[in-house]
Amino acid sequence: MSLQISILTPEKPFWNGQAEEIILPTETGEMGVLKNHAPIITGLDVGAMLVRTKEEWNSYALMGGFAVVKKNKVTILANEAESAETIDAEEAKNAFEIAKGNLEKAEGVKQKVEANFAYKRAKARFQVVKVVNKYS
């Protein structure tokens, strides 16, 4: 038996399916989940999530949230989620470069916090595109 994965966003159920493995961007680093994983609830950071089905790896950009792992079911409650296939590679690369520059130029606490969030978001989108498209 494999893992049953459900990814939910405020707008709609984003993805449901079976997977052999999932790698989550938690607030303390990446966390891999295989079948028979110990039960856990964890916060998700903005970052790339990888899902391995029997056929392939799929990548998604998550914009924070929570994950619940219990009895071979993984439920992800994400603020936002995007599939790599729906992200334009050039736009993601340009947005990443702009966000990186804005973070380096940010002054003051508010501007640094906003620039850091924009950077993490752009980095997540660019990372998932690179995984799928081998873009660099």
Curated annotation (Swiss-Prot):
SUPFAM superfamilies, per the entry: Epsilon subunit of F1F0-ATP synthase N-terminal domain
Cellular localization per UniProt: Plastid, Chloroplast thylakoid membrane
An annotated Gene Ontology molecular function: ATP binding
Keyword set, alphabetical order: ATP synthesis, CF(1), Chloroplast, Hydrogen ion transport, Ion transport, Membrane, Plastid, Thylakoid, Transport
Major localization listed first in the record, in broad terms: plastid
Membrane-topology descriptor: Peripheral membrane protein
Family matches, as InterPro entries: ATP_synth_F1_dsu/esu, ATP_synth_F1_dsu/esu_N, ATP_synth_F1_esu_C, ATPsynth_dsu/esu_N
Keyword Membrane: yes
CDD domains found in the cross-reference section: F1-ATPase_delta
Entry GO CC: chloroplast thylakoid membrane; proton-transporting ATP synthase complex
PANTHER family (UniProt xref): ATP SYNTHASE DELTA/EPSILON CHAIN, ATP SYNTHASE EPSILON CHAIN, CHLOROPLASTIC
Summary of subunit composition and partner proteins: F-type ATPases have 2 components, CF(1) - the catalytic core - and CF(0) - the membrane proton channel. CF(1) has five subunits: alpha(3), beta(3), gamma(1), delta(1), epsilon(1). CF(0) has three main subunits: a, b and c.
Family, per entry: Belongs to the ATPase epsilon chain family.
Function: Produces ATP from ADP in the presence of a proton gradient across the membrane.
Protein name stated in the entry: ATP synthase epsilon chain, chloroplastic
Gene: atpE
